[in-house]
A protein has these predicted regions:
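A ligand-binding cleft/hinge motif common to bilobed small-molecule-binding domains
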Residues: 115-123, 172-175, 202-238
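Extracytoplasmic small-molecule ligand-binding "clamshell" domains
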Residues: 20, 39-113
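Ligand-binding clefts/hinges and TM-proximal coupling segments of bilobed small-molecule sensing domains
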Residues: 168-183, 223, 256-297
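Periplasmic-binding protein-like
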Residues: 133-137, 219-258, 281-297
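Extended ligand-binding regions for polar small-molecule ligands
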Residues: 33, 74-83, 144, 152, ...
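Bilobed "Venus flytrap"/periplasmic-binding protein-like clamshell domains
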Residues: 51-52, 56-59, 69-84, 135-193, ...
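N-terminal secretory signal peptides
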Residues: 1-10, 17-30
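Acidic, polar ligand-binding/catalytic clefts
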Residues: 78, 89-153
Length: 297
């Protein structure tokens, strides 16, 4: 890991602190709010502009080295909104745990951050149809000397594990019997990588997509990613699927978005869009994975 690599990523974190990055065009600061009344979809069509929120988590939604927003979710959102006649997508960077509160406060209109669909989140906002599904994995030292391959191994061997703030993995870990004092909550993927590399924790839990991307972008660091798996809760595998998030009152926007998202999924265009970010055909949600089921789980 070179000092220059860390410096570039520190730029991403500083961008997040200021709250706005570009999606092909200059963006408004996150302090600026969206239309306070009326139909959000019609307002977006009239202005040809929609505002999205991201959390700067690669490869789901992040700023590249030039400050342009990209990633799986922003690129899918861009394709959907283009089909709806909305040409410009403006992005605000918000800490992950503040995305839904900022959405509710109308700082932007859609969360495009690959957010996992959970029962708790569904009480606060409305999710699109599942955009993708992903397995969970662990970032471990090269060679995985402790042979930690699943969350239950973390519990059994009492190793320390890192998770991202407000991410679902902490719940998966505690559900697998991992004690709170084994879990270290961190604010960025880079800090997760550092913690494993430096030996402050043995492993880090996140989606296999995120961890593979992290390793790919940091060659030379002595870490590896375990095979992906579904976490187990109450003896049953937990399906992890993410989607886009809307305010509960924005049904017309959500419904129109879902219709175009389905077209992308069905046509194969979605796979083309997301392949550069480590996603593929296997990440298309199965037909029985629905928002209704995920919100009730």
């Amino acid at each position: 890991m070179t000092h220059g690599e860390w410096t570039r990523r520190d730029f991403f974190r500083r961008s997040a602190a200021f709250g706005a990055v570009a999606v092909g065009v200059p963006t408004l600061l996150s302090a600026c709010t969206t239309t306070s009344s009326g139909d959000t979809l019609q307002a977006a069509k009239s202005s040809k502009t929609i505002k999205i929120g991201i959390a700067n988590e690669a490869p789901y939604g992040f700023a590249d080295s030039s400050g342009i927003t990209t990633g799986e979710a922003p690129e899918v959102a861009r394709a959907v909104f283009k089909a709806l006649g909305v040409d410009q997508v403006q992005a605000s960077v918000v800490p992950f745990d503040q995305l839904i509160p900022a959405l509710t406060a109308k700082q932007f209109d859609v969360v495009a951050a690959g957010m996992n669909i959970t029962k708790k989140r569904c009480t606060a906002a409305a999710f699109s149809a599942p955009d993708y599904s992903a397995l969970t994995a662990l970032l471990v030292p090269k060679g995985n000397p402790q042979q930690i391959l699943k969350l239950e191994d973390v519990a059994a061997k009492k190793v320390k594990v890192a998770v991202l703030s407000a991410a679902v993995e902490k719940g998966y870990l505690t559900g697998a019997g991992v004690s709170e004092n084994q879990i270290q909550t961190l604010d960025t993927q880079d800090n997760m990588l550092r913690s494993v590399s430096d030996g402050r924790v043995y492993c880090a839990a996140l989606t296999d997509i995120s961890l593979k991307w992290l390793v790919q972008k940091n060659p030379g660091v002595a870490v590896e990613v375990t095979p992906g798996f579904d976490p187990v809760e109450n003896g049953q595998p937990v399906v992890s699927a993410g989607g886009f998030v809307f305010r509960k009152e924005d049904n017309s926007l959500k419904d129109a978005f879902n219709a175009e998202l389905k077209k992308l999924h069905d046509s194969g265009e979605w796979v083309r869009i997301v392949t550069p970010f480590g996603f593929g055909q296997s990440n298309l949600p199965k037909a029985d994975v629905t928002t209704e089921k995920l919100c009730a789980a």
